[in-house]
C-alpha cells in the first residue's frame, strides 16, 4: 500500500522513527499478526513521543483514513488479549 504516515515535523528523527515503528506494528497486526508484548512495547515508546490523548487520537484517525488500519481497535484487542500473538480480522 502507498500512503504516508501522519508525522509531526517538530519531532526529532528518533521520535519519527518510534512513531513509524508503532504504526508499522499496527500494520503487522492486520497483515501477519504480531506478538502482543512487542506491540505493547512499541505503544509504550509511542506514548513517550505522543503523551497527549488528543494527539494520539488524531494520529490514529489520520492513519486509519490513509491505511484502513485502526490503531484504536488493535490496542483494544491488545488490552484484552489472552494470547501471546494477535491478528486482526479484516
From Swiss-Prot:
Pfam families with a match to the protein in the record: UPF0223
Gene3D superfamilies registered for this protein in UniProt: BH2638-like (1.10.220.80)
Similarity field: Belongs to the UPF0223 family.
Protein name per its UniProtKB record: UPF0223 protein LMHCC_1569
Species annotation: Listeria monocytogenes serotype 4a (strain HCC23)
